[in-house]
Structure formats: structure tokens, C-alpha cells
Curated annotation (Swiss-Prot):
Region ranges (Disordered): 116-138
Entry's transmembrane regions: none
Tagged with keyword Transcription regulation: no
Zn finger intervals (AN1-type): 144-193
Signal peptide from the UniProt entry: none
Polar residues: bias regions: 116-128
Keywords noted in UniProt: Cytoplasm, Metal-binding, Nucleus, Zinc, Zinc-finger
Taxonomy, superkingdom: Eukaryota
Principal subcellular localisation of the protein: cytoplasm
Record SUPFAM superfamilies: AN1-like Zinc finger (SSF118310), Ubiquitin-like (SSF54236)
GO terms under biological process: SRP-dependent cotranslational protein targeting to membrane, translocation
Subcellular localization, as worded in the UniProt entry: Cytoplasm; Nucleus
Annotated protein name in UniProt: AN1-type zinc finger protein C1271.05c
Length: 215
């Protein structure tokens, strides 16, 4: 049995078998009401910045006791409110991404406004005039789709291409929020913890080598 730390804004706890699949862990959290029933299609587990396969197990990825595993929504998922289950043993912190509503509004406006003129027998016998052709082209012209906006909840600025993509939470951010500290990335806590652990091991090793050399 292993105890995993899943990083976001709230915490839960659950003991899982290291040979159980990650998909079964999703089902277990769904049964407790922490995640929705369709959580597998909306969220994914991440370990060291790599998205985990739902059919693999913790042992396959080398996830040991007290490892830091992240849960983050997929780019197409919506905001989800988690309930509080203090009896479980699985630390879960969740910071949902803000969905982009601009593109959906543009598509709905296009469906309501754009119409295709019908073809009658008179149109087949009498070719349309130049003025009619230009008006038909105007009706068939689709409105320009809006560019993607920053995933930060309080920002509506345009995202940076490539440089604004976060590899840890799959978010797309503007110049002001592209750094992990600026958009409160879900992986920031675990990365700092791993760096602290590496520094601790390095200092302990250097201290031990110093004592051996003095002896």
C-alpha cells in the first residue's frame, strides 16, 4: 500500500495498492464523490510533468510511498467543485483551468446569423447579377474566430505562442502569467519539494564526506 500526495488546493486521503491501475484510483475517488463520474474524460494524473496512462499502475511508473502526483483538468474540461472528505488519506489539490467561452460564442453567433440562399428554378434559368453575387458572398462569409485568451481566471489577454504553454498544467497564458509562480501552477509545490529534497541529500552527503576526511 502506498500513500500518494496529489497536488492542488484541497486535500483528501486514500490508501491505494501500488499494483492497482490509475484508472481504478479515478473510480475510487468518483465513488467517494470527490471526482465526478466522468472524471477520466475530464482530468488526468501527472508525475514529474508526464501525463500518466490510466491502464498503467503506480509500480509501472516507479511511484513510491509519499510521491507527489498531480491531478489537472484536460484543456477541454470545465470547472469542477470538489467536496470535502476528511476521512480519506490521499492529498488532492485542484486548481481548475478557466474554459474559453469566446470560441463557443463565436460558433453560436455564426449558426444564428449565417444563412445559405436557396436555389430555385428561376436562378437556374436566369444567371444572378453581379450585385446578387456579392450579397451571397457576404452571407456565406464566416465571422473570424477569436484568438485564445489567457487561462488565468482574472486575465483576458492574448496567450503567447509556444512560450505561454505550461508543460505541467497544460494551460496557455499571456506574458504576465506564463511563469509557474504567476499562474499558481499545480506542479510548483511538488517541484519545490523535490528540489528541497535533492539539496538535503546533497548537503548530507557532503557533510558525511567531510567527517570521513577529518577522521
Amino acid at each position: 500500500m502506498v500513500l500518494l500526495q496529489i497536488i492542488a488546493s484541497q486535500s483528501y486521503s486514500i490508501e491505494v495498492d501500488e499494483h492497482s491501475s490509475l484508472g481504478n484510483i479515478f473510480d475510487l475517488l468518483s465513488d467517494q464523490g470527490i471526482l465526478p463520474k466522468n472524471a477520466k474524460s475530464l482530468h488526468a494524473f501527472y508525475y514529474h510533468g508526464t501525463r500518466l496512462n490510466m491502464n498503467m499502475t503506480c509500480a509501472d511508473y516507479g511511484i513510491i510511498h509519499d510521491s507527489a502526483v498531480h491531478i489537472a483538468p484536460l484543456p477541454s474540461s470545465c470547472d469542477i467543485d470538489f467536496k470535502d472528505y476528511s476521512t480519506s488519506a490521499f492529498h488532492l489539490h485542484f486548481s481548475p483551468l478557466t474554459p474559453n467561452h469566446a470560441s463557443t460564442e463565436a460558433v453560436s453567433n455564426f449558426k444564428q446569423s449565417s444563412t445559405i440562399p436557396s436555389i430555385s428554378k428561376s436562378n437556374l434559368t436566369n444567371p444572378p447579377l453581379e450585385s446578387e453575387k456579392s450579397s451571397d458572398k457576404a452571407l456565406l462569409t464566416r465571422p473570424a474566430t477569436s484568438r485564445r485568451r489567457c487561462c488565468h481566471p482574472t486575465c483576458t489577454r492574448i496567450t503567447l505562442r509556444l512560450a505561454g504553454n505550461c508543460l505541467h498544467c497544460n494551460g496557455r497564458f499571456c506574458a504576465a502569467h506564463r511563469l509557474m509562480e504567476d499562474h499558481d501552477c499545480v506542479a510548483l509545490f511538488s517541484l519545490r519539494k523535490e528540489e528541497h529534497e535533492r539539496n538535503r541529500i546533497k548537503l548530507e552527503k557532503e557533510h558525511g564526506d567531510t567527517l570521513i576526511s577529518k577522521v
